Amino acid sequence: MEEHDIRMALDRHWAASAAGDQVVEHEIYQDHAVCTYPQSGEVIYGRHNLQALRSHHPGKPSGFEVRRITGEGNVWVTEYVIDYAGESVYTVSLMEFVDGQVSRETQYFSNAFDAPAWRAQWVGREG
């Protein structure tokens, strides 16, 4: 699959995710795809389980913003923010493609936090 085609598939995937379209969102995954959440130690085996897990999430997102997609060849990274009941969850998704579909995904999640005062002299602020 060409990089342009992968990028189009990713755009479709994230748009479907933002819209809550579970069927289209999960078309990007191979049937035997594996998704890991390193922070919790969880591994989700197979597209069916991944779609079921996401379909049963107790909090529906109130916002979804893709900040950046970058990649080359078969490895792509997406940075995005999901809002759950006013809480922003900053997310990084690493996807590995085989035969045009995601075979492996790793996702990292972090809530927003206040910047420590001691760093103020060396940093700027977004926004």
Please name every model-derived segment.
Residues V77-A85:
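Short beta-strand segments that buttress and anchor functional surface loops
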Residues M1-D31, A120-G127:
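Short, low-complexity N-terminal intrinsically disordered segments enriched in polar/charged residues
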Residues E3-D5, Q22-G73, D114:
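A solvent-exposed, acidic/Ser-Thr-rich amphipathic alpha-helical stretch
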Residues N49, I82, Y108-S110:
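Residue-level structural signal for beta-strand termini and adjacent loop
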Residues H13, E25-H26, A33, G46, ...:
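Hydrophobic pocket/interface hotspot
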Residues V92-V123:
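Short beta-strand edge/turn micro-motifs at domain boundaries
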Residues S62-F64, E87-L94:
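Short, surface-exposed coil-to-beta transition loops
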